[in-house]
Amino acid sequence: MQFSTTPTLEGQTIVEYCGVVTGEAILGANIFRDFFAGIRDIVGGRSGAYEKELRKAREIAFEELGSQARALGADAVVGIDIDYETVGQNGSMLMVSVSGTAVKTRR
């Protein structure tokens, strides 16, 4: 499965548009990691705990996106948009949402 943020894939022709596909992942952030991440952010360091959670959520969202595309018989997803949000009480959860158009291609 190929993923692209662009509307086309270089060297390939889109032969069929299968439909819009989406993938979402919402992960709760551990309160102790949140506390220490906040301290590191204050002193200018990077928050490895948040980065790890965002990476995990993004991977899950892309897996879901690919599964939906495969179910439609697609071999690629183009025009992908990736959104990151904090949700829940006091932003206690991380959400990654990806969407795009599932397509069938030919070289």
UniProtKB/Swiss-Prot annotation:
Disulfides per UniProt: none
Any one of the GO CC terms: plasma membrane
Domain of life of the native organism: Bacteria
InterPro entries, per the entry: UPF0145_dom_sf, UPF0145_YbjQ-like
Pfam families referenced in this protein's UniProt entry, alphabetically: YbjQ_1
Family of this protein: Belongs to the UPF0145 family.
Protein name: UPF0145 protein YbjQ
Organism of this sequence: Escherichia coli (strain K12)
Lineage of the organism: Bacteria, Pseudomonadati, Pseudomonadota, Gammaproteobacteria, Enterobacterales
